[in-house]
Structures are given as structure tokens and as C-alpha cells.
Amino acid sequence: MHSAVPATIAAEMHPTESTGSDRSLQLLAHIAALPTPLEMVHAVVCVHIVYGWMPTILDPLGVSKAVDENANRLLEVLNAARSAKEPRLTDDDLGLLRGFANNSTVGASKLLHFLNPCVYPIWDSRVANRYLWSGVSRETFDNESRLWAYMGTLWDWSRDPTVKAACAALNKACPNTKGCTTVRLMELVLFHPPLPQKLKTRRPAKP
């Protein structure tokens, strides 16, 4: 059985475009179309797809080592993450995924995100520059405690009535976001590029 590509993802895909956003949506669609449950060959495909989208080269020996040592548990964690409605990972689970993804918390977060973008946010240097401080070093942000803190913050915000109301208003104003979870909408607000100045100052036309 194959999982369907989520409607909100499929609707936003524009194969003729070449922007980074469109490429990432296409990657999401490829991963969403993989069989359920994932088998090890699919898990390896996933981590290669994720690192094909990143500037860092995936270490195949590290992937092989993680598979050889923890294949069954790795599949359990990946399949549970793929079907989760909220983050349910333990420290051991995240450590296992980190070992599978170049010993990188950033890589593990992106693997989780592409498996289940509605639940697991991306954690990388761009996010850390906003969430922590500008110019934060990799040694400071590429660790599990920072990812847990960021993920926990987003999910705490997602349960706040004021945030829920703001996200509902955004959904109403932007039909393209219909069906997106609160976590995804918060990411949109936090990391959407600023509007050009001419659009900020433009006044509505008189009737």
C-alpha cells in the first residue's frame, strides 16, 4: 500500500519552476509516495533524498553502520515518526536517527521533517539564527538539546489559544495554507522572507 501525497503538498507543487521551495515540495512528494510501512531500502532512500537537498555529503559508511547495528529498531522509529500526530521520540530514538543521518542533529531533523512535515520542524543554521542568535556556531546548535527545545517551543505555541486564533485568521486570508497544521503555519510566519518595500507601502486602489 502506498500513502497518498498530501493534498496541500500536491496542490503547491509546480514542476516547471526551479526554486528551492518547489524542489523541496517535490522531495516531500517522493517520500510521501513511498510504501507504508517503510522497509530498510526505503529508509536508505529517504536519507539519501534528504542529503541530496543539503550541501553536506552523506557518509555511506555511517549509514551502513547504523543499519547493520540497529536495523529493526531504526525502522520502528522511522515508521512511528511517519505516522505520528505529535512528537513522540525519546532521546534514544533521536540518537539512533542522528547516527543514521551523518551523526547530525540537523540531518536527523530534516529526515523527520520530510517523513512527517506536519509534526517535525526543520532545525538547521537558518532556523538557529532566528531562534537563538545571529551567527550561532554549529557546535552550539547542532545538538539534540537544542532541537528538543525548539520543537517543544513550537508545540507549546501551537496549543496557545492566541496562536491558534492567529493561525485560523492566516488560513482564512491565505487559501493556499488551507489544511496546514499550526506548526507549519508558525514556520511560515517565522521564516517567510520579508515583503519588498514597494509592497509594504502600496496603498489599496480607490474603488
Language-model features: where?
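An N-terminal alpha-helical hairpin/helix-loop-helix interaction module that forms a charged
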Residues: M1-G99, P117-P207
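Short hydrophobic alpha-helical segments that form membrane-spanning helices or hydrophobic packing faces
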Residues: G107-H113
